[in-house]
Amino acid sequence: MYRKMEVSLSKDLRKKYGIRSFPVIMGDVVKVISGSRKGEGGKVAEVDHASGLVVVEGITIARADGKQKGFGIQPEKLQITHLDLSRGDRFDKIKSLAARKNIVVEKPEPEPEPRKEETAEAQEAKEEAVAEEKTEVDDNDKQN
């Protein structure tokens, strides 16, 4: 049987949605609130329902062979600081829970993706900078 993987919400999320805890999924941003990793945080990389552990990006442990591996943390030691509401059913669940306490929840606007034009311009600027450096290096080599 799988464990219910609910994690407490941060104070501002509690106030915003009127709920204390919510199931954690990949993509949520969490913070460790107790234990040896207290204060560390990051995006949830994996939720293992069988073992009841949550793996967070950036929190690793060294294996015997020297490689780094994800460190499983118990959900009761975590706090959600940012919810991933990209899945529609998840937002609907929050909305229904908030309605019980007469809290109206507005659907958050999705974060804007960087435009391809901007990224192409940035790429061209980088290429020009590299080309200028090469010409400077070539000029210095010719002088020496």
UniProtKB/Swiss-Prot annotation:
Entry's Gene Ontology molecular function annotations: rRNA binding; structural constituent of ribosome
Start-end of Acidic residues biased regions: 135-144
Segments of this protein annotated with the region Disordered: 102-144
SMART domains the record matches: KOW
Role, per record: One of two assembly initiator proteins, it binds directly to the 5'-end of the 23S rRNA, where it nucleates assembly of the 50S subunit. Located at the polypeptide exit tunnel on the outside of the subunit.
Entry similarity comment: Belongs to the universal ribosomal protein uL24 family.
Protein name, entry field: Large ribosomal subunit protein uL24
Species the sequence originates in: Thermoplasma acidophilum (strain ATCC 25905 / DSM 1728 / JCM 9062 / NBRC 15155 / AMRC-C165)
